[in-house]
Amino acid sequence: ADEFDMKALGADVMITGSQKALACPPGISIITLSPRGVERVYNHDAGCMYFDLKDALKNGERGQTPFTPAVGILRQINMRLHKIDEAGGEEAERGKIKALADDFRQRVKELPFDFVSHSPGNAVTPLHPRNVSAYDIFTTLKDEYHIWICPNGGDMRDRVFRVGHIGSLTIDDNTRLIEAMKDMQK
């Protein structure tokens, strides 16, 4: 959803999940290593099987994984990547996500919410309701309007909810959500 240039940032490892910016079901972890990161994997003992990426790198050379992955999710990732390419590539996808985020954030300003961050990423907008439980907003939108937003758990359950901007969402979805939020105030 936002540009991430490992080389420019000097990052040696990037870890994400299939459910993040690709908007696929959860179940696949994606790890990208810089050449320096690969060297570190081969030259250091990870101490346990789960953090030892040597087998994953060796299997990757032959196009395989060391363990059976969630094949259905891999196929969905493949399909999603093809759709991103067909729609103009990663820059076009990032532009679409940014446009959705900007549109939503501009419209939600008139409602009784505070932005949790002054510089949020484009994938999600966290909001703090001023006078009602965040979890109650989540359940009302889900049960009465058939709209899903992202609830928080733990100490933040009643204080913050999140609105996502990735996947097959449109400006019309933003309009429907804003209208539902306005209707809930009546």
Where do the language-model regions lie?
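Conserved PLP phosphate-binding loop immediately N-terminal to the Schiff-base lysine helix
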Residues: 1-17
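Solvent-exposed alpha-helices and their adjacent loops that cap or buttress functional pockets
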Residues: 5-9, 21-25, 68, 117, ...
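Active-site C-terminal subdomain of aminotransferase-like
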Residues: 21-106
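Flexible, glycine/charged-enriched surface loops at secondary-structure junctions
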Residues: 87-97, 112-118, 152-154
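Conserved PLP-binding catalytic core of the aspartate aminotransferase-like
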Residues: 113-144
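A common structural junction motif
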Residues: 143-149, 182-186
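PLP-dependent enzyme catalytic core of the Aspartate aminotransferase-like
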Residues: 155, 159-186
